[in-house]
Swiss-Prot record:
One of its GO terms (cellular component) is DASH complex. It comes from the Eukaryota. Its main location: nucleus. GO terms for biological process: attachment of spindle microtubules to kinetochore; cell division; mitotic sister chromatid biorientation; protein transport along microtubule to mitotic spindle pole body; spindle attachment to meiosis I kinetochore. This is DASH complex subunit dad4. Residues 15-35 form a coiled coil. Pfam families: DASH_Dad4. Component of the DASH complex that connects microtubules with kinetochores and couples microtubule depolymerisation to chromosome movement; it is involved in retrieving kinetochores to the spindle poles before their re-orientation on the spindle in early mitosis and allows microtubule depolymerization to pull chromosomes apart and resist detachment during anaphase. InterPro entries: DASH_Dad4. Keywords: Cell cycle, Cell division, Centromere, Chromosome, Chromosome partition, Coiled coil, Cytoplasm, Cytoskeleton, Kinetochore, Microtubule, Mitosis, Nucleus. It comes from Schizosaccharomyces pombe (strain 972 / ATCC 24843).
């Protein structure tokens, strides 16, 4: 005769393994999606850095030429 507790534990262990495999697949897909998002955000970050550098250069130029005016 088989031990009913052993059968129950085996069934539970099988369910746990199945759920962990599904979780692993979901996390793998999430990581891939995050990589794609990060790659697409690189262009936005670059444009932001360029704009900040441009604004800093314009401010420096206006201060040096004494044409910087107070905000309205």
């Amino acid at each position: 005769m088989n031990n009913p507790m052993e059968e129950q534990q085996s069934a539970l262990l099988g369910r746990i393994i199945s759920n962990v495999e599904k979780l692993n697949e979901s996390i793998t897909r999430l990581n891939h999606s995050l990589q794609l998002i990060n790659m697409s955000n690189m262009n936005v970050e670059l444009a932001s850095q360029m704009w900040a550098n441009y604004a800093r250069n314009v401010k420096f130029h206006l201060e040096e030429t004494h044409t910087l005016k107070d905000p309205i």
